[in-house]
Structures are given as C-alpha cells and as structure tokens.
Amino acid sequence: MKPYLAQARSWASLLQHYGCIKKQHMRDLFAADPQRFDKFSLIFNGILFDFSKNRITEETLKLLLDLARERELQQGISRMFAGEPINNTENRPVLHVALRNRANRPIMVKGKDVMPQVNVVLERMGKFCDRVHRGQWRGFSGERLTDIVNIGIGGSDLGPAMVTEALQPYAKSGFRVHFVSNIDGTQLAETLKTIRPETALFVISSKTFTTQETLTNAHSARNWFLRAAPDDKAIAKHFIAVSTNRSEVEKFGIDPCNMFEFWDWVGGRYSLWSAIGLSIALYLGMENFEQLLEGAHEMDKHFQETPLKQNIPVIAALVGIWNINFLGAQSHAVLPYDQYLERFPAYLQQLEMESNGKHVTRGGASVNYATGNVIWGAPGTNGQHAFFQLLHQGTPLITADFLASAESHNPLGEHHQILLSNFFAQTEALMKGKDEAEVRAELEEANLAKGEVEALIPHKLFDGNRPSNSFLFSKLTPWTLGALIAFYEHKVFTQGLIWDINSFDQWGVELGKQLATTILPELQGGEEVNSHDSSTNGLINYYKRIRHL
C-alpha cells in the first residue's frame, strides 16, 4: 500500500525545493537559459505542448517525476488499460479507452473481451447514420430528418455539444444539431420553436434512462411530437435511445431496435466516445467521428507507452500538481483562441471538477492537501476584455492553458494573425510582467508630470510570474480534437493517482438530488413548509407566495 501522500519522501523533497525557489521569477529563468523552451516543451504528432512558462526548473521536474514513480503511476496506468476495477467505490473498470481502441487489441473485463461489443455498436451507429444521411430513414411524413435533437445532461450533453460545435466545419450539409439538457423548460421550448416534428430526430441519451432532467425533457418532447404525428407508431422513426437500461427504454415507448447501448464501465463524463456520441456522428458523419476516435487512440498509446519524462499528459499533470499543491493555485483558466472551442472550458469543468473534486483518499481517509481546482474560461480575445485583468494584476494565483491553431477554418483578411498575436502576447505578458523601470520609462516618454508619473506607477505594474501552458497545432480537425480531449482525460487520471483519490465516481452530486426529491412534493399546494432550516423554509415559502402573482 502506498504511504499517505504527505508522508511520501518525494513530497518532502518537493516542499524543501519549493522553499528554495519560491521567490525566483520566470523572467530570470528565461534570461539565464536560452534553451529553456527546448527543455520544457514537447511535440506529439504536430501538437506542441509548451510548459516552459511555469515556475519550474530542471530540478523541479526531476522531483515531480520522482513523485510519479513513488506513487506507482506507471502501474496505475497499466491497471486502467488492463480493465481492472480501478473505480473502487463502484467496483467497476474504467474503459473509455476501449471505445477508441482502433488497434482492436483484446481488453478483458471479468475474463471477457469487450471489443466485439464495442465494434458491434460502432457498426450499428455507422449504418444508422448512413441511412439518415442518404435519406433512407425518413419521418412519418416521408420527409428527410434534418434536425438532430440530443436530450441528455452532464456527460450525455457536454461532450457531444462541445464536439459538434468545435467541428462545425465538418458538419454534414443540410443537417442541424440541437442540445437540450436543462430541466428549465425554457431550453426545450425555445428549441422546439426552431424545428418541425416532421423533420426532427430525437436522441434521448441517458445511461440509466431514469435521470430526472432528461426523462422530463424527453416526455415533454414526445408530447409535443405526438400533437403533430398521426399516432404513437410514428415515435419509432423519430426517437432513438442511447442507454444501458433496455427495460426503461421500452417503458418510455422507444423500440429496443432503436436503442444503442453502452456499458457500466463507461463513465458519463468519458462517454462521448461511445454511443453517447451518436449525435456527433449524425451531425459530422461517421467518418469524422472515427477520426475523433483515432486521435484519442493515438494519445492513449502515447500515454501508455511513452517514458514519463516525455509523456505529455503526465508532465502536464505533474506541473498542475506543483501549481496547486506548492504554489497554491486554486483556479485554472482554459483559454482557447478559437471560437469553435467556445464550449471546451465547460466540458473540462465536468471532466476535471467532477473527477478530482474529492476530499478523501481511495481508502476513505481525509486528505490534508488540495485536490483539483476550479476550471473556467472563455475564448480569446473575448476574455481579454472581461477577466484577464484579474489574471494579470489580481491577488489570486490563476494558472492557465492557452490553445490555438496555426490555420483557421475561416481565413478572413488578417483576423487570424491578429488573433494569434494576442495568443502569443498574453502568455508572454503573464510570464514576464512589467517592472517599475519599464513603467516609469513609458510614462516619462508620454511627457507626464513627475507627480503624475509617481502616482500612476503602482497601477501600471505587472508582477508577472503567472504560470501558463500553451498548445499550438496546425488546424482544429476531428483527429486533433480527439487527441486533445484524451490528453485532458489522462492528465486528470494522473493527478488522481498522485493524490490517491478515485477520479471515476461522483458521490458529490447525490445529496442535492436526494433533497430535491423531498422538496418537490412540498412545492404543491399552499401550505407553509417548516421541515427544513429557516433559510430553506423561507425560500420555499416565499416562492409559494409569489409564484402566481
């Protein structure tokens, strides 16, 4: 059994090392070593990962790699790929990697190779998408189905929604895709205003097919549809299920022949590679969905086979642990300089925060070190005019990932070069900052009075020394996106192994759902509620007083 993390020898060495270098500025590290970029950057199949703008030295990296070895990282990676039940609180394997196992090597679960099942579902998806795209699968009116409506929440929504937006340039001509996740009826109502029952194809995505939000939205969508359809039989042409629960799918009224399955060893936030990605394949075409899988598979091989020192997910995870546990960063911004990646930060919020937002070890002991951090972000350059002020001059230490492509899908004049000039400038500014001498020289050059110069200097100082990573790739393609998503998955897994937490359960989402089940019947009628604390009682009772005003 591994020792408690804070008792690990390498952890103590890192603490001592931090004490020695905590006041070093990255400006000086770059000035002292012209080869710093070469030493602290890696390239994977054309994707550049630059981590040189972090407050690390070669000794830091050596000690972090020692930590990874002491925490038996390589063995943990092998256990996941071997199909061992590493999700220990649910006694399940974690095999999203099997879903994109393009080499088709056997992956065993309880003595049975899962790959034949995976391949059958992929083949069914391909045939179904082909029929829809060719117009062979038509609606009750005989019209082609052109509006794909994905109804799901969490992993059944965030991944497919992010991927379809990111890869819009690859969309099938004549098709639109819509996503409904929120129980707030507004989202479904506004979506239904934009489509026609005759051309709508609803994909109901729910692992259990009992998720309250998804089933409520699905029933409302069905009721809307049946008001236009000739009879219940029309449902068979317009409603598809993606689930593990055949009986609940049948109970809803969907023909099991129209159900695409996946398995309990696929976690929700890791499920876009499965039949949950059906809306992706319908919108982009199966060939592009398979390219997404190919990119992820290549990153899987890199993660599994590459020595730790050249292993991009491992290095990113270790640098993240350094920033979180030693520098004290509690917030991490994801900043894609690509409008198509607008949903990428929201996708990573679930991936990282639901995976590693844990307060006990795998063995149930309380941790006394930080695990995970707050993930957020927005596309550049929008963020520069909104929250970058805090990144540059605020008191919290906020680390960041910058992502950009060298080539735009929409080359308009100098737009892309201007975009990338900002991408490069922001990472340099966060690292370098601007000291008093530079500020003073600028102000004096502007011919300001001496008193005005002195008054403005503190406001125009940039401390710099703010850590960031940069990802630069040729073009945002299905393959590239697949590799990037898999990179983040493996980074999260690596950090979970180091912290000795289970990155694959999510018990933290349960309590609120349980309480909501209790509260829902209390919202009926006009009786005053007094079964909760005074704040919750007060909120419920005020709602009941004003709801019909």
Curated annotation (Swiss-Prot):
Keywords in alphabetical order? Cytoplasm, Gluconeogenesis, Glycolysis, Isomerase
* Enzyme Commission number, as recorded: 5.3.1.9
Domain of life here? Bacteria
* Major localization class: cytoplasm
Q: Known SUPFAM superfamilies for this protein? A: SIS domain (SSF53697)
What is the active site of this protein? 354 (proton donor), 385, 513
Give the GO cellular component terms, alphabetically. Answer: cytosol
Among PROSITE patterns, the record links this protein to: P_GLUCOSE_ISOMERASE_1 (PS00765), P_GLUCOSE_ISOMERASE_2 (PS00174), P_GLUCOSE_ISOMERASE_3 (PS51463)
- Its pathway? Carbohydrate biosynthesis; gluconeogenesis; Carbohydrate degradation; glycolysis; D-glyceraldehyde 3-phosphate and glycerone phosphate from D-glucose: step 2/4
InterPro entries attached to this UniProt entry: G6P_Isomerase, G6P_Isomerase_C, Phosphoglucose_isomerase_CS, SIS_dom_sf, SIS_PGI_1, SIS_PGI_2
An annotated Gene Ontology molecular function: carbohydrate derivative binding
Q: What catalytic activity does the UniProt entry give for this protein?
A: alpha-D-glucose 6-phosphate = beta-D-fructose 6-phosphate
Q: Which GO terms describe its biological process?
A: gluconeogenesis; glucose 6-phosphate metabolic process; glycolytic process
Give compartment(s). Cytoplasm
Per the entry, what this protein does is:
Catalyzes the reversible isomerization of glucose-6-phosphate to fructose-6-phosphate.
Family (UniProt): Belongs to the GPI family.
Task: List the protein's name.
Answer: Glucose-6-phosphate isomerase
Tell me what organism the protein belongs to.
Answer: Nitrosococcus oceani (strain ATCC 19707 / BCRC 17464 / JCM 30415 / NCIMB 11848 / C-107)
Taxonomic classification, please?
Bacteria, Pseudomonadati, Pseudomonadota, Gammaproteobacteria, Chromatiales
